[in-house]
């Protein structure tokens, strides 16, 4: 079952506005509606609950999570998937437009191994990753490379891993 919030009667005073255009569809940044300081509190509680209540593990007091100085562009590796079955967002479906380009380079939709959300900008890895991914995508379009059909396993392009270092090397 799926649901979509259509109206909020009152927003939490700690709610944040998600900065990613793909928020709510991608699944990569599920916590963006909370400020980072609040995310850490809830993640701490989740870890403790998983260990104590679910795992039945008696623990001494757990030290607080040490937050990162970076809340954007902090990952050093991302794996993108190519697919010939691009996921259409609810907004795209509502527009009732026929899309000529159904290929995508991006991330799997949560719960759908064969559907990939086309990512234009990802805030998880340094911006050079976005430029590389989009350049490879454009090159593949221009040269008519086939994107994989994840069900039949036919197609040339399947995955792309981009790894960066703190020095900016690729």
Go through each PLM region and give its residues:
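Accessory RNA-recognition modules of RNA-modification enzymes
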Residues: 1-170
């Amino acid at each position: 079952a799926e649901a979509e919030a259509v109206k909020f009667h009152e927003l939490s005073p700690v709610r944040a506005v998600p900065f990613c255009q793909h928020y709510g569809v991608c699944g990569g940044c599920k916590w963006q509606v909370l400020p980072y300081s609040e995310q850490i509190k809830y993640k701490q509680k989740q870890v403790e609950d998983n260990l104590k209540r679910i795992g039945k593990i008696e623990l001494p007091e757990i030290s607080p999570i040490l937050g990162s100085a970076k809340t954007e562009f902090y990952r050093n590796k991302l794996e993108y998937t190519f697919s010939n079955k691009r996921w259409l967002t609810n907004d795209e479906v509502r527009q009732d437009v026929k899309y000529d380009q159904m290929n995508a380079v991006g991330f799997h939709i949560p719960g759908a191994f064969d559907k990939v959300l086309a990512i234009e900008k990802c805030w998880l890895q340094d911006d050079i990753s976005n430029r590389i991914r989009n350049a490879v995508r454009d090159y593949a379009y221009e040269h008519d490379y086939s994107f994989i059909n994840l069900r039949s396993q036919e197609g040339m392009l399947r995955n792309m891993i981009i790894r960066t270092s703190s020095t900016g090397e690729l």
